[in-house]
């Protein structure tokens, strides 16, 4: 599998936002949040950090994104998405196996109900270290 990684650009903002919104719609407890405020915050976060995001391509086709950055003495894996039509093809596993090569501790937030993602992270040595809120775990490796 030949994956190509490119720094994301402004033209990617909307696609990343749509993936984020889809995850929020699927896994967030929407009745207990200010939905519009959360979506505005997510969009601004992506827009303000777009050049820290990485676009993942397979055969010149965009298949996903991730935001992996240093946070003090750790690394945070934030916004790791593979488009649904490309899931279960080994892409997420390949990307994750490359990202975990760092010596630093890596942490991430994952929706409690996102069992597929949790299982993937566990296969690569991540463990749930605490519940962040009702809907999210913090996992660490």
Question: Where on the chain are the PLM-derived regions?
Answer:
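Accessory recognition modules or surfaces
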Residues: 89, 93, 139-141
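Acetyl-CoA-dependent GNAT
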Residues: 7-13, 17-79, 83-85, 96-98, ...
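Conserved beta-strand-loop-alpha-helix junction that forms the acyl-donor binding cleft
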Residues: 108-119, 134-141
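Active-site acidic-Proline motif in GNAT/NAT acetyltransferases
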Residues: 83-85, 89, 112-113
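Conserved dinucleotide-binding and phosphotransfer motif residues
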Residues: 85, 102, 124
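Conserved GNAT acetyl-CoA-binding A-motif
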Residues: 96, 102-113
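Conserved active-site alpha-helix within GNAT-family acetyltransferase domains
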Residues: 93, 113-131
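Extreme N-terminal starter segment of soluble prokaryotic enzymes
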Residues: 2-5
């Amino acid at each position: 599998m030949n994956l190509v990684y490119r720094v994301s650009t402004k033209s990617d903002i909307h696609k990343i936002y749509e993936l984020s919104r889809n995850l929020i719609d699927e896994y967030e407890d929407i009745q207990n949040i200010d939905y519009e405020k959360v979506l505005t915050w997510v969009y601004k976060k992506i827009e303000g950090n777009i050049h820290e995001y990485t676009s993942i391509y397979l055969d010149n086709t965009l298949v996903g994104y991730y935001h992996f950055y240093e946070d003090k003495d750790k690394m945070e894996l934030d916004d790791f998405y593979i488009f649904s039509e490309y899931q279960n093809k080994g892409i997420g596993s390949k990307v994750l196996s490359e990202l975990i090569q760092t010596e630093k501790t890596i942490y991430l937030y994952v929706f409690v109900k996102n069992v597929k993602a949790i299982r993937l992270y566990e296969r690569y040595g991540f463990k749930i270290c605490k519940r962040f809120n009702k809907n999210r775990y913090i996992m660490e490796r």
